[in-house]
Design a protein with these regions (language model features):
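Small-residue-enriched hydrophobic alpha-helices in membranes
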Residues: 1-139
C-alpha cells in the first residue's frame, strides 16, 4: 500500500468534525494557490469546484458530502447550498479547468487538492471505488 492509499485509509477513519476542520485548512491552501497562479475572478469558488471534481467521480453527492460543503462554506459570500455545488460544477463544465489546474499546479498544491478531495469523499465514512480511482489517478 502506498502513501496515498494509506492516507485514504486514515481519512476514512476520521470523524465528521475532524474532516470539516481538515477540509477548511485544505480549501484555504487550494484557494490561495489558485489566487496566486490562476486567472479566475473567484479563487474560493474555483477551489470549491476542485472539491466538486472529486465528489463527482461517483456521479452524485451524498448527504455527508453535502453537509461538509454546507459546514465549510456557510459563512462565505457564495450563494450556493452544499447540494448545489455539484450541479454548478456540471452545469458550467468545470472538469476541463480542474484537470488543467491539477496537471499544471505545483507538487504541494496538487497534494493539497488531492487531500481536499479525499476529505470530501471520506465525509460519509468511506471513499467509494470511483472516487478512490479518480484520486489515485493523479498520484
Amino acid at each position: 500500500m502506498n502513501y496515498w492509499e494509506r492516507l485514504i485509509d486514515v481519512y476514512e477513519s476520521w470523524d465528521f468534525d475532524s474532516l470539516c476542520d481538515e477540509a477548511y485548512e485544505l480549501s484555504c491552501a487550494v484557494r490561495d494557490d489558485i489566487r496566486r497562479n490562476c486567472n479566475v475572478r473567484e479563487p474560493l469558488y474555483a477551489a470549491i469546484m476542485v472539491g466538486a471534481y472529486f465528489m463527482d467521480a461517483d456521479g452524485f453527492a451524498d448527504g455527508a458530502e453535502v453537509s461538509l460543503f454546507r459546514n465549510l462554506f456557510e459563512n462565505q459570500l457564495i450563494d450556493l447550498g452544499g447540494d448545489r455545488f455539484l450541479a454548478e460544477y456540471r452545469r458550467y463544465n468545470w472538469q476541463p479547468w480542474v484537470e488543467s489546474y491539477l496537471r499544471n499546479c505545483s507538487k504541494s498544491a496538487l497534494e493539497a487538492a488531492l487531500r481536499f478531495g479525499m476529505v470530501i469523499c471520506a465525509s460519509d465514512g468511506f471513499i467509494r471505488d470511483e472516487e478512490r480511482e479518480r484520486i489515485l489517478s493523479w498520484t
